[in-house]
Amino acid sequence: MALILGTEYCKMDSNGRFKFPTAFKKQLASDESRFVIRQGFTAECLELWTFDSFQIEVQMLSKRLNEFDLEDRKIIRQMTRANIVELDSNDRLMVPPERKSVLGNAKEIVLQSTGKCIEIWERNAYDKMNDNVDDLAELVNKRLGGQHELPSAGDAE
């Protein structure tokens, strides 16, 4: 699974369809057309995962959590509450009806890469979220300051 990078602005039609950006498609393997959409956890957005990367994420989650523990089970259930979607013949994805409420009646959306997945934001909510990152340098220093070791090539996979 390729690491998808970038930010793309898209139009969404009344049926919840949007054209998957060419810039993102070029970063995928030629046969990748299945995706998973789920509710974002820390933001007013959706998360779009390639099908393969979502399977890996769920496998890693399963290794860390105990499916017999009620709290862990709740996390697993929430993390896997998702929909599988596929690119149509026009390279469009459709946001499932039960997920559209997160985006409201958006006509403009923003696809923002996080490295692992792509967040889907309603344009105004995205702009508002970005207005709140004035203290980004302070936040980066707080969370990453002093961590100067670079990962080895094997750690990046």
Model-found features: residue ranges?
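A positional/architectural concept
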Residues: 2-42
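Short, structured motif recognition centered on aromatic/hydrophobic residues
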Residues: 16-20, 91-95, 118-120
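Residues immediately flanking
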Residues: 22, 51, 89, 97-99, ...
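A short beta-strand-loop micro-motif that forms or neighbors metal/cofactor-
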Residues: 29-45, 82, 101-129
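Short, charged/polar surface micro-motifs in flexible loops or helix N-caps
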Residues: 42-44, 53-56
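Short, solvent-exposed interaction modules
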Residues: 56, 62-100
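Short, Lys/Arg-rich amphipathic alpha-helical interaction segments
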Residues: 124-157
